[in-house]
């Protein structure tokens, strides 16, 4: 809000309702958008794929796309670095990676060195391009406001899914 007001856009501060709901006159957004939908519509469908970042695919491709994100490329980086960011006193995930060289090195190691060599390629999204985009566009974006505390909340319940598939892939090698 302060950055928008500094550019001359007025009245950008969030409003807090009586029920403690925060309402802002703007949305923090990012360019990367991915929506992978199973193309199984028995009664026909609109041309959903004409939307930016919308991919229509068969069930296997949808599953591979989800696996790429959840078990290798994005979520494991959050799960490994978020709790350490909390312990180190970093509120925002992006700020932590932008200012702490060691945390950025660890995040890159998890995605590039450990994940990419064993991630199944869904064919419609390139795992390499997806990870590159994370580190060049998404992770450094402090306007997203993603907190390390949020990333840490469910880590104990997600260890198996976020790291297990990668470990299993290495065991198979």
Give the location of each predicted region:
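Substrate/ligand-engaging "lid" and interaction regions
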Residues: 1-173
């Amino acid at each position: 809000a302060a950055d928008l007001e500094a550019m001359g856009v007025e009245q950008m501060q969030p409003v807090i309702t009586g029920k403690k709901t925060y309402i802002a006159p703007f949305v923090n957004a990012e360019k990367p958008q991915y929506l992978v939908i199973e193309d199984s519509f028995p009664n026909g469908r609109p041309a959903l794929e004409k939307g930016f970042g919308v991919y229509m695919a068969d069930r296997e491709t949808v599953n591979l796309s989800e696996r790429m994100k959840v078990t290798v490329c994005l979520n494991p980086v959050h799960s490994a670095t978020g709790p350490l960011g909390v312990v180190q006193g970093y509120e925002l995930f992006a700020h932590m990676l932008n200012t702490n060289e060691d945390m950025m090195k660890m995040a890159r190691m998890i995605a590039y060195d450990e994940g990419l060599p064993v991630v199944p390629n869904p064919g419609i999204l390139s795992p390499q391009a997806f990870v590159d985009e994370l580190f060049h566009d998404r992770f450094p974006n402090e306007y997203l406001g993603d907190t390390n505390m949020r990333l840490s909340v469910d880590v104990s319940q997600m260890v198996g899914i976020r790291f297990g598939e990668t470990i299993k892939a290495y065991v198979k090698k």
